[in-house]
A protein has these predicted regions:
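Short, flexible loop segments at boundaries between secondary-structure elements
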Residues: 244-247, 284-310
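Phosphate/Mg2+-binding loops and adjacent switch elements
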Residues: 86-191
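Redox- and metal-dependent alpha/beta enzyme cores, enriched for Fe-S-associated oxidoreductases
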Residues: 209-251
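A transmembrane-helix-recognition feature enriched in membrane-embedded lipid enzymes
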Residues: 2-47, 309
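Residue-level signal for inorganic ion chemistry
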Residues: 26, 61, 95, 126, ...
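Conserved beta-strand/loop subsegment of P-loop NTPase cores
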Residues: 79-80, 139-143, 167-177, 190-215, ...
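Walker A (P-loop) phosphate-binding motif
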Residues: 32-86
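G-domain G4 guanine-recognition motif of GTPases
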Residues: 172-181, 199-203, 217-222, 244-249, ...
Length: 310
């Protein structure tokens, strides 16, 4: 079954959001209570948390990968920590494909302890801003410039796991996309001490798809962001097909994509995450767009990270 994010999550003053408000209040009450009841764990190694408050599609995993690359330049032994969900195996394969040590467990605490035991210098949490059981040295929150905070309401009235006010508990905000001074001002009104950086996705294999008409499909948090990235890089996208985040493709769906592409003389392109989700199917017709995350003002970003940790 395909379940997409509802459109009212990005509409101000939606009646549906208003009617769901009691559930949102209950959800936040439960979240606060859960945080207060959890035992807090300290660790011998510094912990960076790369999280979000907007549910899905903010670029946490690419930022984690880039952080590993930056910290390795300081000759540090870095691991990524991920709470393991079977449905998120695509992200696991993506991280491991970059030759990065990943510790995954149903408990983030146990995964961090395993990294400590193996003498890693630092652990990066891929998600976990809402996990109060871990005392972190640095909280980085990701946003995508195209969605930002939606209607700024919490689940299920809106797309936020926590209200914007929770940003006061973070030190760095990374916005993927174009500069948005209005949103920056909103963040600074919540916490004037938070640092704001921007990032961009840089495709590294565009030549593979240039001069081809493309069928693009994606099962990520925000598929339209992927399609826009293709078009912004002057690729000819003829057909776009969206699937929900971490979607489990059936053989029939993949066969339909291939048959449509053959019939219409199209080359198939997808995201790297989607590719690793269907890698076991061994379909040579499906290729992925390889991307690198670039942090703008990277030197300042890198210095701030290292200052917070070591």
């Amino acid at each position: 079954m395909k379940i997409f994010k509802p459109k009212f999550w990005h509409k101000k003053n939606s009646l549906i959001s208003f009617f769901l408000l009691p559930l949102s209040i209950f959800f936040q009450f439960f979240l606060v209570l859960k945080k207060k009841l959890k035992k807090r764990n300290n660790f011998f190694i510094p912990i960076i948390c790369v999280g979000n408050i907007y549910v899905g599609g903010t670029g946490k995993t690419p930022l984690c990968i880039e952080l590993v690359n930056l910290l390795r330049k300081s000759n540090k032994k870095i691991a990524i920590i991920k709470k393991f969900y079977k449905a998120h195996n695509d992200e696991v394969k993506l991280i491991e494909s970059k030759k990065i040590k990943l510790f995954k467990d149903s408990s983030r605490v146990l995964a961090i302890k395993a990294a400590e035991k193996d003498n890693f210098d630092c652990a990066i949490l891929d998600d976990g801003f809402q996990d109060s059981s871990i005392i972190k040295n640095l909280d980085i929150i990701c946003f995508n410039e195209k969605q930002l905070a939606g209607n700024e309401m919490t689940l299920p009235s809106g797309p936020l796991r926590e209200p914007l006010s929770s940003l006061k508990n973070s030190q760095i905000i990374v916005i993927n996309g174009n500069v948005n001074k209005i949103f920056e001002k909103k963040i600074k009104n919540i916490s004037n001490n938070v640092s704001i950086y921007y990032s961009q996705y840089l495709p590294t294999n565009l030549n593979e798809f240039a001069n081809h008409k493309l069928l693009a499909f994606a099962g990520i948090g925000n598929p339209n962001n992927f399609f826009k990235l293709l078009e912004d890089n002057n690729l000819q996208v003829v057909k776009k097909i969206s699937f929900p985040d971490h979607y489990n493709y059936s053989k029939k769906e993949l066969d339909d994509l291939i048959n449509f592409s053959i019939k219409n003389n199209l080359k198939i392109i997808t995201t790297e995450k989607d590719f690793y989700r269907i890698e076991h199917c061994k379909i040579p017709q499906i290729k992925y767009l390889s991307i690198k995350l670039k942090i703008l003002n990277q030197d300042k970003f890198e210095k701030e990270i290292i200052k917070c940790l070591f």
